[in-house]
Amino acid sequence: MSARLPALWKRLSSTISPRPAPPKAHHHAPIREAAFPNGYVLTGLHCGIKKTGALDLAVILSTTPKPASAAACFTRNAFKAAPVVVSEEVLQRSASTARALVVNSGCANAVTGKQGMEDAWAMVRATDALLGHSAKESETLVMSTGVIGQTLPICKVLAGIESQSSDSQTKSLGSDFTAWERAAKAFMTTDTFPKLRARTFSIDGREYKMAGMDKGAGMIHPDMGPPRMAGQLHATLLGCIMTDAAVSPRSLQSALTYAVDRSFNSISVDGDMSTNDTIVVLANGSAASDPAAEIDEERDPRTYQIFRDELTTFAADLAQLVVRDGEGATKFVTVSVNGAATYEDAHRIASRISTSALVKTALYGQDANWGRILAATGSVPLSVPIDPTRVSVSFIPTDGSPALPLLVNGEPETVDEARAKEIISVEDLEIEVQLGIGSENAKYWTCDFSYEYVRINGDYRS
């Protein structure tokens, strides 16, 4: 049977010429130093996990006198990696505060048993030591990404962390663009560019800053929730966002949970959930010395909602970078599902379309096969059943030209195939599904499946 596979592959691929992924480096550009939040120092370095010599360890410290409010959303995979379990424990012990984050790439430290847990705690303790004598135990969150089932070269990792101590000649912690960029690069595995963003926003005349980085290109279909939430099963998605706003821990977690559902939990590259998916937010309050300026959902819902919406927009920007860098991807696709009875219904349908291998391969082949979109839509159980006579499907061009209806109120349109191919041949496009049931909408961001995706993942460990 195996001898037939090359011939079968050749026959199946003969009708579509492999196309290289479009250039992606332009999604990363220098950021002015004034855009980064106050009160953070960070770096990225090579400690020896990656054989290539690439950066594989990031250290991020908050320098404010008091610990930063900390919030996180973690994978709901039953096989949670050691750093996920340890970070959940740190947040529980510290009443949702933290002073540091340490991240390694090249080894996931997942399904590594007792040794993996010991190694994750060792990374926490080593980073805690960088904070000085005033630091309490367990003020560091930890994240890892890479191959599952392999243990960390922990001596190399600890040496890398210790190289950032105050008396070390190799200390490289900083707050300029280079420091932020090196940290972002240390997150990377199969990523083709570092994913780093920063922005400034105002609430009631007070200026705040927010910066963040994430990584991910494969094994991307997150379903993350707050610490200790039980959930269902589904390369890793890791991300961190730092702000100099003062936000109460409870409100920060509430805002992050809302934001993640509309950003990182709304992307898919290949439909596979990682054991390590983690998003962390630190809010150190360095922009507001007045305790009354702390953002709190119960005390001032209006101010909280402004912050929550800023965080959601920023998180969506970071999440979309992951899809744009999807392994072998040639297209960035927005899936919009409108007119559902509930947001959850719209989100489930958008997720199903975004993970359909048939839809994703049709996108790569530039085939306007809307029947696959409709089949995916109809396969999802909803709180209010679909009425097929109300459903419409369209391609939305990204150049501002008119939409191309494919199905209108359950009736197929006579499609201009040349126009459809023109729309689907560009890098960015949107699929819109109108259910005609209610007023709730949801978006998902996905990419196509290419031959290159198969090659990357077939060779991942070699």
Swiss-Prot record:
Its main location: mitochondrion. This protein may be expected to contain an N-terminal transit peptide but none has been predicted. Keywords: Acyltransferase, Amino-acid biosynthesis, Arginine biosynthesis, Autocatalytic cleavage, Mitochondrion, Multifunctional enzyme, Transferase. It comes from Postia placenta (strain ATCC 44394 / Madison 698-R) (Brown rot fungus). Catalyzes two activities which are involved in the cyclic version of arginine biosynthesis: the synthesis of acetylglutamate from glutamate and acetyl-CoA, and of ornithine by transacetylation between acetylornithine and glutamate. The record marks 145-146 as: Involved in the stabilization of negative charge on the oxyanion by the formation of the oxyanion hole. The active site is at residue 236. GO terms for molecular function: glutamate N-acetyltransferase activity; L-glutamate N-acetyltransferase activity. Heterodimer of an alpha and a beta chain. This is Arginine biosynthesis bifunctional protein ArgJ, mitochondrial. Substrate binds at residues 189, 215, 236, 327, 457, 462.
